């Protein structure tokens, strides 16, 4: 959460969820059993500087969502997909081949904690696109179906069946809307 400093809801959701988990650990033996079998990794706030400045980007003017070692394949909507012209324009990716410190820490953390595990599920919680709330599947760097699409669709069906009145959420691959660097 907190990749975009001004989008505070993602951090708040993660913190509320963690508070709920901790409170349930007092009495929920099923949850305790589950937590003894899995590793839970959470970063509620990545962009501390952006939060303090109330900006989307970090203090260097870099949009951390676009500052990653991933280049989009094919067409990206400029500047939405990321641009390198100026940190004064939105969606600035930073200098080529230079990750911001926040991005370096995140990449290293994912490599150490998630990669190499038999199964991992990553979720990015942030707000802000269009007039409809969305829950997007990852891999927006290309238009091909993301890996494990069947599993993502199955999770969507579980969510739909568990929360049948949530019709305000649109769940789909992000790349159906636009491709992006990062």
Where are these regions (language model features)?
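Structured catalytic-domain cores with a bias toward divalent-metal coordination
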Residues: 1-182
């Amino acid at each position: 959460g907190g990749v975009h400093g001004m989008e505070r809801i993602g951090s708040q959701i993660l913190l509320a969820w963690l508070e709920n988990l901790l409170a349930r650990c007092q009495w929920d033996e099923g949850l305790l059993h589950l937590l003894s079998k899995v590793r839970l990794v959470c970063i509620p706030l990545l962009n501390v500087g952006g939060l303090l400045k109330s900006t989307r980007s970090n203090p260097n003017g870099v949009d951390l969502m676009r500052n990653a070692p991933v280049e989009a394949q094919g067409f990206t909507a400029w500047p939405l997909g990321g641009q390198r012209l100026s940190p004064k324009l939105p969606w600035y990716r930073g200098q080529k081949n230079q990750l911001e410190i926040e991005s370096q820490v995140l990449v290293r953390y994912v490599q150490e904690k998630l990669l190499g595990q038999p199964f991992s599920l990553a979720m990015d919680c942030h707000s802000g696109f269009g007039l409809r709330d969305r829950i997007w599947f990852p891999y927006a760097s290309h238009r091909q179906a993301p890996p494990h699409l069947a599993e993502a669709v199955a999770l969507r069906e579980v969510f739909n069946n568990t929360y049948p009145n949530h019709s305000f959420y649109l769940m789909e691959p992000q790349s159906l809307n636009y491709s992006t660097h990062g």
